[in-house]
Amino acid sequence: LSSAASDVYKRQLHAVCDALLGAANMRDIGYHFPDTAGEFKNIDSKILLKKTVELIAGKGYKVGNIDATICAERPKLKAHIPLMQETMAIVMGIDADDISIKATTTEKLGFTGREEGISAYATVLIEKTD
């Protein structure tokens, strides 16, 4: 992935972590992995995703599926989505077919439309393993 696409992907991974933790009623990514703690400062977001999956597994859950949306004018992400899905699947130990990643824009509206930033959202289904 390009540097810009990697930054966007990082935001998406954080959104997925937050959604997984929220679905398991385990607070959020900042609670478990504060960037003020030296061990988490500049950590690879894929490691956080793996640790998040381990945390929810410890509470008796597994990932069912992921529906993620990235909202950005740039970079254009369509060509990168299959690699993003495959990488996430490997990290989480699930099938890439259980991960939907969509890229959209705000049609030039708001801070994302002005290219001042991006946003990422995720909805997840987790299932009890017991």
Q: Where do the language-model regions lie?
A:
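Single conserved hydrophobic/aromatic residue that forms the stacking wall/gate
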Residues: 1-9
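A short glycine/serine-rich beta->alpha loop
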Residues: 6-7, 35-40, 108-112
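Glycine-rich anion/phosphate-binding loops
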Residues: 10, 42-47, 80-81
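Short alpha-helix carrying the canonical HExxH Zn2+-binding catalytic motif
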Residues: 12-17
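Glycine- and Gly-Pro-enriched alpha-helical subdomains that act as flexible
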Residues: 20-62, 73
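Generic secondary-structure signature for well-ordered alpha-helical cores
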Residues: 21-25, 53-61, 82, 89-94, ...
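Short, conserved loop-to-beta-strand elements that form functional interface hotspots
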Residues: 67-72, 76, 82-112
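C-terminal edge-of-domain segments
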Residues: 112-130
